[in-house]
Every structure is written in C-alpha cells, then in structure tokens.
Design a protein with these regions (language model features):
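Conserved GHKL (Bergerat-fold) ATPase module
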Residues: 1-226
Length: 226
C-alpha cells in the first residue's frame, strides 16, 4: 500500500468496504487493518485524493494531540460546515467521511498511534483549549456589549431550555453566528440519524448551542434584548 500508492488506491476504491468490515469485526487485527484505510480530507486538493491515518499524523501540527473528522453526505456540504471554521483558522487537517460506515469504524478505533480520534462537532476538543485562554478582543464590539451579551445568553438559554443542554459563548466559530455541538461521548448527528432510521424509538440527544459574540447578527440581537 505504501510502495505502490496508485495501485493500492485503485484496490481500495473497489474493495475498501471489505477492509472496513475487517476493522469493525476483527478486534485483534483492527490496528493493522486501520493502517490500510484511506480518506479524503480538508487538505486534499480534490475529492479523489486519498490519504492514510499515518499520513495524517505525519502532517499534524507539532502541538496537535487529536485526529479530527467530519461526516456529511458529500465534500461540498462539509466545506460549508461551521464546525470547520476553527480548523481552517488554525490550519488543521480534518478527515472527510462520506461513507456512513466510516464514523462507526473510527469511533470503534478510538485512537490511532496513541492519538485520540474525535468528531469535529464535539464540544470539548483539545484544539479549543488555547482559544479558551485568549483574552477576548473587544475593540470592535458595541459599547457595554459584555453585559448585553451575557444577558442574551441567559435569554436564549431560558427560551431553549427544553431543547438544549446549555447555551454558551463559542470559541470555535469565526464566520457563523451559532452552531449546535454534541456533548462528549455522544455520537455525531449524522450517526444518530442513521441509528434513528433503524430504531424508531431512538431519540436524538440534546445539543449545546454555541454563540459567536463577534457576529453582527448576535450583536444586534443583544442590543434588541437589552
């Protein structure tokens, strides 16, 4: 697979599903089989370009501790996802999963070469820790915005109390006004919808709503909510 990259990628496109099943069912050899898996990613120049988990790790930032992925029906949808905004800002690669089975496989692996595998829509990602420590730049914010924003968060939290777990300031959003993220340990929305298709009684879990205090729409809402 390593020495004949093009030939292996052709093989993977034809028989990759079989190897994926091996990762899922052959627990003893799952780490070896995981080396044979191939993915597209945010750093790939085209939807046809593939890379291995080992190649992903080799390209990780020096202080990056986790492997990240996002799941959607196609690459175009993932490119527009608000979950990717912080990754673009930090220039961190994200694996693109379009096969519904891929996320089950990666969540089953848990880690690769001692690097935890995490979905980009999870609440507490390691790459967000530095953002938590940064002092918020308030130079372009309206006067007395801090109190207005806190009041807006409380209002939204009360309004959506029966539909969300929490409402808080986001440290991942750059361009979008808000997003919903999964609490730790909860499958992604994509996987939960797949589960719901086979189990009508399955209820999709409540999410955490994150609000981007820098977004103009949020600032206007805060002013109107005063």
């Amino acid at each position: 697979a390593k020495n004949e990259k093009e030939k292996y990628e052709t093989f993977w496109r034809q028989f990759g599903r079989i190897l994926k099943e091996g990762v899922h069912f052959d627990f003893e050899n799952k780490d070896t089989l995981a080396q044979l898996m191939r993915f597209n990613s945010s750093m790939c120049k085209s939807p046809d370009e593939l890379l291995s988990l080992k190649e992903y790790i080799d390209r990780m930032k020096p202080d990056q501790k986790e492997i990240y992925y996002i799941t959607a029906v196609n690459r175009e949808t993932m490119e527009k996802s608000p979950y990717l905004e912080i990754f673009r800002k930090k220039d961190i690669e994200v694996l693109y999963l379009t096969d519904p089975n891929d996320e089950f496989l990666l969540s089953g692996l848990h880690e690769f070469e001692k690097k935890p595998i995490r979905s980009a829509d999870q609440a507490n990602l390691d790459l967000l820790k530095d953002s938590d420590k940064k002092i918020v730049d308030t130079t372009e914010e309206p006067q007395n915005y801090e109190e207005s924003f806190k009041h807006l968060l409380k209002t939204i939290k009360v309004t959506l109390a029966d539909r969300t777990i929490d409402v808080k300031e986001s440290n991942r959003l750059v361009d979008s006004p808000c997003c919903l993220v999964n609490p730790d340990g909860v499958p992604s929305v994509h996987v939960q919808k797949l589960i719901q298709m086979v189990d009508a009684n399955y209820k999709i879990s409540k999410k955490i709503m994150e609000i981007n205090r820098k977004h103009r729409m949020i600032q206007n809402l805060a002013r109107m909510n005063e």
